[in-house]
Amino acid sequence: MNMANLKAVIPVAGLGMHMLPATKAIPKEMLPIVDKPMIQYIVDEIVAAGIKEIVLVTHSSKNAVENHFDTSYELEALLEQRVKRQLLAEVQAICPPGVTIMNVRQAQPLGLGHSILCARPVVGDNPFVVVLPDIILDGGTADPLRYNLAAMIARFNETGRSQVLAKRMPGDLSEYSVIQTKEPMVAEGQVARIVEFIEKPDEPQTLDSDLMAVGRYVLSADIWAELERTEPGAWGRIQLTDAIAELAKKQSVDAMLMTGESYDCGKKMGYMQAFVTYGMRNLKEGAKFRESIKKLLA
């Protein structure tokens, strides 16, 4: 399947429990990292990888996410009137020309796997991409036009095999999706076949692996049947991880070692790391911000 025909699914129906109380009234995907909400970084990455159709799986509490990608005629008219052309261009670039963003609702919180199934009427029985909205890949450490999601799509087009992005995570893996591969992976961008994939394992120390999934998946159409058959797993939810694990028993599924850095912005530490990193790079305020950080650390 040609890259341009792949749709990307972003599940944004989660309640953001790890970021309370900030997420009590604000969707976690709308929390800002400097001057853009988290979800904007995700969409920018997807578009950079060549995808033109994006499906947001939302919840009734996530109207702000939908509104962010809608056109605000009043705001644009005001910026035009006040000759704020740079700001106007930035607002209009939120949803780039030629990119379509669609919304479907997940009525019940039945897990990530169920959230993906909610997108099936829009995606159809086709291959597709899944990108989790709270894990930001640092575009300053790996060009999104070439690496990670873009490379996964290229490999999928070449091999037809589903792809899962992985990173090394020494320490406790009990809160993550743990990957075990047939061969060790050392170099960034390296690929190996998945032999085991477990969501939040009870005893991660029994697994001979320090690899975790990084919220980027390119999935063949065969995953739909596995999702339909998947019973509730960890936390009583239908897990995408379980469906991919079953698929990997029947056909080759690849793990690709992530290039660059990532931040789990669904948790406070990752969010703070991302904010500081992007703040120091900000073209307008970055230099002053770096100086203020130096003073704090002195």
Curated annotation (Swiss-Prot):
UniProt-listed Enzyme Commission number(s): 2.7.7.9
Family: Belongs to the UDPGP type 2 family.
Keyword set, alphabetical order: Capsule biogenesis/degradation, Lipopolysaccharide biosynthesis, Nucleotidyltransferase, Transferase
Positions in coiled-coil regions: none
Annotated protein name in UniProt: UTP--glucose-1-phosphate uridylyltransferase
CDD domains per record: UGPase_prokaryotic (cd02541)
Catalytic activity: alpha-D-glucose 1-phosphate + UTP + H(+) = UDP-alpha-D-glucose + diphosphate
InterPro entries assigned: GalF, GalU_uridylyltTrfase_bac/arc, NTP_transferase_dom, Nucleotide-diphossugar_trans
GO biological process: capsule polysaccharide biosynthetic process; lipopolysaccharide biosynthetic process; UDP-alpha-D-glucose metabolic process
Record Pfam families: NTP_transferase (PF00483)
